[in-house]
């Protein structure tokens, strides 16, 4: 019958095709199944931060599954890095240890090594180095053949004032082999760098009193920024040489002084103040650009010749001829030398070496009663008679210093650093 007949070739081909269609439909159903009902499939971990950046929603980070990071444990809780470590998953949350460590028999024997063998190894290690020996009974100290000098004190207990008293500032002039050469060079250069004596008469808008106010202000600037005395002397020299060639309005006189002080600071100081500091001390009267342009103009007028001999340099040489050295004499001579900077008349007509000689003699006579040394007469060629005109003018300036309108120099030398020499009473007369 038909129902019992064997299927023909056509029927088998149709059955095979139907079976293939069923398998294909089954695969499609599995692919289209709801993800919530699907079997958990292990997906590769992705960085949630990238998803947040792409979506632009900062809160999307909470909606996605954050990657699991490994918590850094303290050093004592770190797991042992051993290939024999096994972590049974059914005991991970129990009270028993989460992992067990398999120890080989050789390791057990090494752990059970008796302490005596370790002691033997330690003795062998100590015996290996001849400089190390095992602790034993202490031997008596070997007596010294010479007595130890106990007069020395520890550097930590010594008074710092003792060390400071031994320190002496180094002078570039303290080179005996070159004394004569240095002095000869300075004497030649002071003539070349000397300002014109009557230049103020050709200035249409400034006077000697304005110049005195400017120099007095520069003294305060030098004290404010802890500048060297040589810097002040150089700045005044630059100002006088510049005014000898250029006419300046009174509104620009302070700008000239500021640029001169800036140049002198760069030439003399190790750490000169910045340009902004000089703008600040003028109370922003001038801009930084104006100060720099004036600096350029001053350099051009001076032909970049900044190494001018000053009263301070000659005084430093003359101080070497004191027998004995007297700090108060040196401070008073420096005070008198700076007083000569205030008044252009009459001191512009004297060379710096002459002013320094008069200041040194007047200071020496005021403090000790001594006169111009014979050694300086031989060195400089100046006699007391040749110094007399400048000495008389400087003596009058010294007498009238308390009544002078500009008092910055007197206030400066009241300091204990200069032994308060501005408070000394000047001699009424000079026995010349």
UniProtKB/Swiss-Prot annotation:
GO cellular component, one term: microtubule organizing center
PTM statement from Swiss-Prot or TrEMBL: Polyubiquitinated via 'Lys-11'-linked ubiquitin by the anaphase-promoting complex (APC/C), leading to its degradation by the proteasome. Deubiquitinated and stabilized by USP37 enables entry into S phase. Ubiquitinated during the G1 phase by the SCF(FBXO31) complex, leading to its proteasomal degradation.
Residues bearing the modification Phosphoserine: 5, 55
One MF term in the entry's GO annotations: protein domain specific binding
Annotated localization: Nucleus; Cytoplasm
Region (Disordered): 26-45, 55-75
Entries under CDD domains matching the protein: CYCLIN_CCNA2_rpt1 (cd20561), CYCLIN_CCNA2_rpt2 (cd20564)
Pfam families the record matches: Cyclin_C, Cyclin_N, Cyclin_N2
Modified residue annotations for N-acetylmethionine: 1
Residues in coiled coil: none
Keywords: Acetylation, Cell cycle, Cell division, Cyclin, Cytoplasm, Host-virus interaction, Mitosis, Nucleus, Phosphoprotein, Ubl conjugation
Record-level GO BP terms: animal organ regeneration; cell cycle G1/S phase transition; cell division; cellular response to cocaine; cellular response to estradiol stimulus; cellular response to hypoxia; cellular response to insulin-like growth factor stimulus; cellular response to leptin stimulus
PROSITE patterns registered for this protein in UniProt: CYCLINS (PS00292)
InterPro entries found in the cross-reference section: Cyclin, Cyclin-A_N, Cyclin-like_dom, Cyclin-like_sf, Cyclin_A/B-like, Cyclin_C-dom, Cyclin_N, Cyclins_cyclin-box
Cystines in this chain: none
Subunit details: Interacts with the CDK1 and CDK2 protein kinases to form serine/threonine kinase holoenzyme complexes. Interacts with CDK1 (hyperphosphorylated form in G1 and underphosphorylated forms in S and G2). Interacts with CDK2; the interaction increases from G1 to G2. Interacts (associated with CDK2 but not with CDK1) with SCAPER; regulates the activity of CCNA2/CDK2 by transiently maintaining CCNA2 in the cytoplasm. Forms a ternary complex with CDK2 and CDKN1B; CDKN1B inhibits the kinase activity of CDK2 through conformational rearrangements. Interacts with INCA1. (Microbial infection) Interacts with human cytomegalovirus protein UL32.
PANTHER family named among the record's database cross-references: CYCLINS (PTHR10177)
Its job: Cyclin which controls both the G1/S and the G2/M transition phases of the cell cycle. Functions through the formation of specific serine/threonine protein kinase holoenzyme complexes with the cyclin-dependent protein kinases CDK1 or CDK2. The cyclin subunit confers the substrate specificity of these complexes and differentially interacts with and activates CDK1 and CDK2 throughout the cell cycle.
Record family assignment: Belongs to the cyclin family. Cyclin AB subfamily.
Protein name, as recorded: Cyclin-A2
């Amino acid at each position: 019958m038909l129902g019992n007949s064997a299927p023909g070739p056509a029927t088998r081909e149709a059955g095979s095709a139907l079976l293939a269609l069923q398998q294909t439909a089954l695969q499609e159903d599995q692919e289209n199944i709801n993800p919530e009902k699907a079997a958990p499939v292990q997906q590769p971990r992705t960085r949630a931060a990238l998803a947040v950046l792409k979506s632009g929603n900062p809160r999307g980070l909470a909606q996605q599954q954050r990657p699991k990071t490994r918590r850094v444990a303290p050093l004592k809780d770190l797991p042992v890095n051993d290939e024999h470590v096994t972590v049974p998953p059914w005991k991970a949350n129990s009270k028993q240890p989460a992992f067990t460590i398999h120890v080989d028999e050789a390791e057990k024997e090494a752990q059970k090594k008796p302490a005596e063998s370790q002691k033997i190894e330690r003795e062998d290690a100590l015996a290996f180095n001849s400089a190390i020996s095992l602790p034993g009974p202490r031997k008596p100290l070997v007596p010294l053949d010479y007595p130890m000098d106990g007069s020395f004190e520890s550097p930590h207990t010594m008074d710092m004032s003792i060390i400071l008293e031994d320190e002496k500032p180094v002078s570039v002039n303290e080179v005996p082999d070159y004394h004569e050469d240095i002095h000869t060079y300075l004497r030649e250069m002071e003539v070349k760098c000397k300002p014109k004596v009557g230049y103020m008469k050709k200035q249409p808008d400034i006077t000697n009193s304005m110049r005195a106010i400017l120099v007095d202000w520069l003294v305060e600037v030098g004290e404010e920024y802890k500048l060297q005395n040589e810097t002040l002397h150089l700045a005044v020299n630059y100002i006088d040489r510049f005014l000898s060639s250029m006419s300046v309005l009174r509104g620009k006189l302070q700008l000239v002084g500021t640029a001169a002080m800036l140049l002198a600071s760069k030439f003399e100081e190790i750490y000169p103040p910045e340009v902004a500091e000089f703008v600040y001390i003028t109370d922003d009267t001038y801009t930084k650009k104006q100060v720099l342009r004036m600096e350029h103009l001053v350099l051009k007028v001076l032909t970049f010749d900044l190494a001018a001999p000053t009263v301070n340099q000659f005084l430093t040489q003359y101080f070497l001829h004191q027998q004995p050295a007297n700090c108060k004499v040196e401070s008073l001579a420096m005070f008198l030398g700076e007083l000569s900077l205030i008044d252009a008349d009459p001191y512009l007509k004297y060379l710096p070496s002459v002013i320094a000689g008069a200041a040194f003699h007047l200071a020496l006579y005021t403090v000790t009663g001594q006169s111009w040394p014979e050694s300086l007469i031989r060195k400089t060629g100046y006699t007391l008679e040749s110094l007399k005109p400048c000495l008389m003018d400087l003596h009058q300036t010294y007498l009238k210093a308390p009544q002078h309108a500009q008092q910055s120099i007197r206030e400066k030398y009241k300091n204990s650093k200069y032994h308060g020499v501005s408070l000394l009473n000047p001699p009424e007369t000079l026995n010349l």
